[in-house]
């Protein structure tokens, strides 16, 4: 609950802390956590599975987005990267459906920065499907295609699955990144956005070298 509150309440103190660097040698129990109940990994052979749990409305996820995007590009074929939107409350669900709808249309990577900016810069919170469709239309997305995806059984199934993953991975705050179904980290652990990328580098390398 403490991590959830720190995620949802943006403070100047935490924002300042996020600019600090993480220790050079990441430590278990501080910079990352070994999950008590590791989860199955579905990454292709030779790749390390990395899952980011996030919420479009989370200010820290918005701050973290450029870093995680750059980190994923840097890792390239080393990792199998996935995102899972979380809904700690029912009023978060429209954002989960938004993510899976744009993913179904194959435009998630293209529109995610614009969605974050709309919510956090323009204060257009995109809490209804109509508001989402209207906004995405400004990004060149066909409203009908979006609404069809939003209301589809497949998108609802993805939302239901994300709720299960939230429990299975014991996620209590975002952004949280899980490496290889077992190692959990994020800015709430490292108190640093750049430091989180360093810890992710460490975890991926350790998994690759079979040291973790």
Curated annotation (Swiss-Prot):
SS bond partners: 58-61
* Gene3D superfamilies found in the cross-reference section: Glutaredoxin
Instruction: Give the signal peptide as a residue range, or say none if absent.
Output: 1-21
Q: What is one term from the GO cellular component aspect held by the record?
A: periplasmic space
Record key words, sorted: Disulfide bond, Periplasm, Redox-active center, Signal
Q: Note the Pfam families from the entry.
A: DSBA (PF01323)
Report the InterPro entries cross-referenced here: DSBA-like_thioredoxin_dom (IPR001853), DsbA/DsbL (IPR023205), Thiol_disulfide_DsbA (IPR050824), Thioredoxin-like_sf (IPR036249), Thioredoxin_CS (IPR017937), Thioredoxin_domain (IPR013766)
What is an example of a GO molecular function annotated in this UniProt entry? disulfide oxidoreductase activity
Q: Where in the cell is it found?
A: Periplasm
Primary localisation category: periplasm
Family membership: Belongs to the thioredoxin family. DsbA subfamily.
What is this protein's function per UniProt?
Answer: Involved in disulfide-bond formation. Acts by transferring its disulfide bond to other proteins. Involved in the production of protease and alkaline phosphatase, motility, metal resistance, and multi-drug resistance.
Q: What is this protein's name?
A: Thiol:disulfide interchange protein DsbA
Q: Which organism is it from?
A: Burkholderia cepacia (Pseudomonas cepacia)
Q: What is the lineage of its organism?
A: Bacteria, Pseudomonadati, Pseudomonadota, Betaproteobacteria, Burkholderiales
User: What gene codes for this chain?
Assistant: dsbA
């Amino acid at each position: 609950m403490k991590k959830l509150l720190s995620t949802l309440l943006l403070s100047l103190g935490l924002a300042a802390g996020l600019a600090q660097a993480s220790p050079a040698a990441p430590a278990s129990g501080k910079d990352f956590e070994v999950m008590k109940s590791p989860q199955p990994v579905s990454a292709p052979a030779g790749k390390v599975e990395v899952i980011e749990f996030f919420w479009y409305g989370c200010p820290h996820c918005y701050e973290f987005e450029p870093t995680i995007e750059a980190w994923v590009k840097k890792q390239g074929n080393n990792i199998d990267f996935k995102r899972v939107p979380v809904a700690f409350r029912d009023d978060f669900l429209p954002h989960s459906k938004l993510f899976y709808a744009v993913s179904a249309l194959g435009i998630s990577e293209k529109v995610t920065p614009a969605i974050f900016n709309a919510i956090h810069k323009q204060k257009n919170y995109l809490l209804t499907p109509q508001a989402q469709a209207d906004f995405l239309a400004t990004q060149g997305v066909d409203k009908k295609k979006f609404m069809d995806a939003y209301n589809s059984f497949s998108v609802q199934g993805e939302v239901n699955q994300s709720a299960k993953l939230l429990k299975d991975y014991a996620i209590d705050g975002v952004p949280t990144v899980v490496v290889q179904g077992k190692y959990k980290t994020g800015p709430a652990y490292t108190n640093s956005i750049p430091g989180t990328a360093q810890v992710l580098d460490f975890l991926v390398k350790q998994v690759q070298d079979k040291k973790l």
